[in-house]
């Protein structure tokens, strides 16, 4: 067995000393104050984490339109998972234009966090013994002679070997220590990363592994991504669960506004105005509230919010956030689709 010594400095992160309970519950403080309308989904994700902690791997997809709150939900879930000291977490993200240019981009980003984070030495040792084709992707962590040794080991390595090695490495790492692996914006994923995820989801061995993917279904269709077929096949075989985020209702918007107003009473009709104009999209909702504040339509008075003009005189127009998102979607269309629009 070879020992691998770090070249780069690894900063340790202190971990809680409390032990994890057998059952996972979601306390109210798991989510930020402005986290609304997603409590039931968060509870289901927590239940999936409970299964992963018991050794049953979980493959989950959180889907929804742009601005619907996928990343906010993931943040809240990771905050919940961080309360368990044995749970290791890593997060990678696909980047528009990188799918097909840099193979395994989101996985390498997540692994990069693991080889530099808490218990990094263990991760490097496992990669050295189980997945040298992946360890070589982080040359800054190795001495020159170690890099040369790895290069000899992986000479002639195939894509199939890389898939097998990372699956085996993650299973070794999660045999006793749970891992939450989050990969975002998977509508831009590269085919090689999908091969790894497909293999991880289908393998039957025990693993304390929870994989959580986020993506926009419309983008998957527009880009003709193979992710759609993979997800459907895994769902059919009960190897994947999908959580599609719906738009917020008026009660959710009201709860958000009250949280922003520190619990103060809201002007009559304000929640309906914001809900109607945002159509329940959390990103647009937040943008509308900012515009109301910046334009002076809402002011803080005696600790609460007060309208400076009647609701029917407030002209919200099209928020910059919405306009930019629409422009991006139009830019992605081909000429025929633009003509139809």
Question: Where are the language model's segments positioned?
Answer:
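C-terminal end segment of the histidine kinase catalytic
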Residues: 13-17
